[in-house]
């Protein structure tokens, strides 16, 4: 199984030789958001206490490119990662964008520079998580 973007507006998953167009979940609201997140020891317990709403929403483990790919497929609606390297995020940026997703750092900077990354299925969810992550985004 692998993921690819055909253009800046079209992304696919190829599984067992069959290509299927993918898209983020465009109908999701914050009320029923599915979140994959991991802090990998980067975010201390004291810092985690500053974002209790984010912690309560975490439902799925996070695995860099796989979690970002699941968002592009519509399986999860937000992915929150810390201390990503360029090689963690660069390959998936065109796929997520082509599937309709939003990417940035936690302080709303360009995700292509790596760092603490937020990927969301729509702008409303993205902005809500940026606000919730603000206490730890510096």
Positions of predicted regions on the chain:
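Oxyanion/phosphate-interacting regions
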Residues: 49-54, 69-138
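Acidic beta-strand-loop-alpha-helix segment within the catalytic core
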Residues: 1-68, 117-138
